[in-house]
Amino acid sequence: MTTPSTSTTPKTLYQKVWDAHVVATPEGEAPIIYVDRHLVHEVTSPQAFSGLKVAGRKLRAPEKTFATMDHNTSTRSASLDALSPMARTQVETLAQNCKDFGVRLYDIHHPNQGIVHVMGPELGITLPGTVIVCGDSHTATHGAFGALAFGIGTSEVEHVLATQTLRQLKAKTMKIEVRGQVTDGVTAKDIVLAIIGKIGMDGGTGYVVEFCGEAIEALSMEGRMTVCNMAIEMGAKAGMVAPDQTTFDYLEGREFAPKGEDWAEAVAAWKALKTDVGAEFDATVVLDAADIAPQLTWGTNPGQVVAIDAPVPNPADEANPTIRASMEKALDYIGLTAGTPMTDVAINKVFIGSCTNSRIEDLRSAAKQAKGRKVASGVTAIVVPGSGQVKAQAEAEGLDKIFIEAGFEWRLPGCSMCLAMNDDRLEAGDRCASTSNRNFEGRQGRGSRTHLVSPAMAAAAAIAGHFVDIRKPY
């Protein structure tokens, strides 16, 4: 856990957490940093554990490693028989590896099982000032708590399991400030899509981003997680938000959060985890929250995004020939014509879920749109809670009944249709309003067409059969 720095040089939040975790700086080599929490799942861990077995190594700190099953699990049944042969092998291998190495596992039958980036925070595994890694690109989610969190590759997973450390080069720093407050109908998802639309999908490359400003401070922890989750979609190494009372209120009493006197001591230390006055960033981006409308992607990367009241962009209006060619290619794949109002774009599939938008606040937002209405004819819509805890809470609030009565399918926790890795996938030609984080070609299935939106926008599209501006009656 990070302790307050005694240095008088103003530092950014990232610099404070980084400095507290550097354990060695070998000459001519990348620094070695300590890892506080290591999250693993069934897809990127098998080879790492296998490498340990071949080398005869044990885990350096098994109590700091937490495992779950999420990417390849079924959202229709908790039975192993519901899995494909490959998926079954992966989850069974993870279970055996966790048993062999003494790792805590939240398997498909555990009430707290879920998407790794949903489950970790709600259990209090994610804490301010910690370094968190996982073999998954959306590990940046945990940065919402003031943690330095980022995805790693399988060889690095093995290295962390064996040493609880990692070689890392220090990143540059970027401040993204969202000033003022958003208007009704605009959510955290719209904020982060607007940011990516402004700086592009590579605008954050080489940086750790700190999100700040009144609009970010006003977000719940669920909203902050949505924003940090998509830091990777702007090319950033990680995204962070300074912890505050909202953070502390969320964490207090959670299973792995400090208790008693340790809690008071932890909060005192966490309050120092903010960028100092006078600290310098390598880059700064500013947005006015009042200018942000509900967003949706029109192309094949998260940076190809527009406001709901805008038309499909025209490549001919783009001066840069490389960007123009990319736009033309995207429109050809996505099957849209420049100038078409986004509200005229019909969909036949809706996915509400993923590590971006499957928390209780997300489901409440979607249910508000669905209540008393019916899914449009020809539309298939599924709602996938991010964890067992989210599912139980949603059911206690009656959200499942709202969705089911409206014609949505209510599923078990898992990564589901975010990626075409399990049985929840799109067919060629399907057009999906999705609350996930990536709209690449084939991401949700070969030939599939994905539009990234907020949970409210996705639910509204399911009802209308096409995209709508949720700020207006429909």
From Swiss-Prot:
One of its GO terms (molecular function) is metal ion binding. It is an enzyme of class 4 (lyase). [4Fe-4S] cluster binds at C355, C415, C418. Keywords: 4Fe-4S, Amino-acid biosynthesis, Branched-chain amino acid biosynthesis, Iron, Iron-sulfur, Leucine biosynthesis, Lyase, Metal-binding. Pathway: Amino-acid biosynthesis; L-leucine biosynthesis; L-leucine from 3-methyl-2-oxobutanoate: step 2/4. Its cofactor is [4Fe-4S] cluster. Pfam families: Aconitase. One of its GO terms (biological process) is L-leucine biosynthetic process. It catalyses: (2R,3S)-3-isopropylmalate = (2S)-2-isopropylmalate. Gene3D superfamilies: Aconitase, domain 3 (3.30.499.10). SUPFAM superfamilies: Aconitase iron-sulfur domain (SSF53732). NCBIfam families: leuC, PRK05478.1, PRK12466.1. Belongs to the aconitase/IPM isomerase family. LeuC type 1 subfamily. Heterodimer of LeuC and LeuD. Catalyzes the isomerization between 2-isopropylmalate and 3-isopropylmalate, via the formation of 2-isopropylmaleate. PANTHER family: 3-ISOPROPYLMALATE DEHYDRATASE, HOMOACONITASE, MITOCHONDRIAL-RELATED. This is 3-isopropylmalate dehydratase large subunit.
